[in-house]
Amino acid sequence: MTGDKDPQSVSRPNYGSISHPPSSEPQQEPLRTTYLSEKIPIPDTEPGTFSLRKLWAFTGPGFLMSIAFLDPGNIESDLQAGAVAGFKLLWVLLWATVLGLLCQRLAARLGVVTGKDLGEICHLYYPKVPRTLLWLTIELAIVGSDMQEVIGTAIAFSLLSAGRIPLWGGVLITIVDTFFFLFLDNYGLRKLEAFFGILITIMALTFGYEYVVARPAQVALLQGLLLPSCPGCGRPELLQAVGIVGAIIMPHNIYLHSALVKSREIDRSRRPDIREANMYFLIEASIALSVSFFINLFVVAVFGQAFYQQTNEAAFNVCANSSLHDYAKIFPRNNLTVEVDIYQGGVMLGCVFGPAALYIWAVGLLAAGQSSTMTGTYAGQFVMEGFLRLRWSRFARVLLTRSCAILPTVLVVVFRDLKDLSGLNDLLNVLQSLLLPFAVLPILTFTSMPALMQEFANGRLSKAITSFIMALVCAINLYFVVIYLPSLPHPAYFILVALLAIVYLGLTTYLVWTCFIAHGVTLLAHSSHQHFLYGLPDVEEKGKISG
């Protein structure tokens, strides 16, 4: 095993050269027709000094990225964590957010240093078959995330209309509102980023209101936040802890963030400018994810205070004796612990704290669904253009993604019930966790390559932390598989699972192999994969590499 600074990696021409910005294609018109069509200029300030003006110029991509930490899937995971474990899992939420920040830091750094997003670099470095499989997994993650947004938005419309808008009607409304929000592109990048900021503010105010009225016990809350323990916890709490990690770190978000940072004008021929951009993007991402953490904390704390170990019978009685007594029927009359979801959670808030709490909850849920819709659209566009070099209009792209998301959701709503819809939301959180290696492994691979990143390649500490994240994710996924296999309804499903597992493990093994090569394990470097050690020669940079 050799060190990271192989001398050949310095002397050979490479894709990530800072003095000569790379280009994977001959000079063409830009592929982007949205977001990246406009570049935000960075003001000149005195070198070596911190500038709020400059921080403001860099502010935007991190907050758009943070919306994936606040989508309806996260909200459902939060409220279930509170209802199942009280405040005991707040420390898991905290450290999952920190791990998410570390992954997003790598994504931003890759985009700043190379001038290309993760999808584009995957297109350059991976052969056709693994590249195509990798693209399909990320598209699956995007569709899964979009399904969660459809579910959350539909439930929000149902709550706001007091049930007058059926769930299937709310699902269909999401088709229209998505295209409406896409028109925001026409009003400029900063206005679009400001709109996302407004949606995040709405979530902070609405869920913060619930936190204030619930008045959680602050001492117990701080203990749950700062002490990494879970006294008296069993399998349900462990499953919920795993669900928190799966909901927080989203695979498509890593691809998204690496593209969003390209919206700022950065002189990549100057190392100080790159170093400065990395610093400001890290500060902005830290602020954005701090805001998202507190919003998630509000939700966990509210349900941990009001609904921890609550029984269905108690929930029924509370609602039956409130002004929202018509909703009491959604809780079965038994002594089992209530299994809350984003619909029942809103109803319970209204029953306990008054109707205003229900409607405010629904507004926050609507903001979460709508903001996630837009970022999911951008992620899909960046991933498709990066991997396939295929240019689609944003309308065609969102129509494809939303159609794939709406069809299964409508089928569940029409032929099953609300409980199955919420169960689908939980299953989608599991899916995001299973697909996470297909984002973390590539970002760890490419940000660890000195030939690509030069002096900005990962150091030993960064490699160790990211490798720990990868090992944690793999352990979580293995645990999920062991837990869910016995619940398969028919032996024939085992054949399907086995076939999918072969593809999954094969692609994961390939990505791990190339990751080791990028870390300097030269013994594994086949002649066809030398570019993971030394970068791409000029002929490959010009798009002439085959496969």
Curated annotation (Swiss-Prot):
Topological category with respect to the lipid bilayer: Multi-pass membrane protein
Cited Pfam families: Nramp (PF01566)
GO BP terms: iron ion transmembrane transport; iron ion transport; manganese ion transport
Glycosylated residues, chain numbering: N321, N335
Domain of life: Eukaryota
Compositionally biased intervals (Low complexity): 21-30
Polar residues compositional bias, start-end: 8-17
The name this protein goes by in its record: Natural resistance-associated macrophage protein 1
Record organism: Canis lupus familiaris
Taxon lineage: Eukaryota, Metazoa, Chordata, Craniata, Vertebrata
Name of encoding gene: SLC11A1
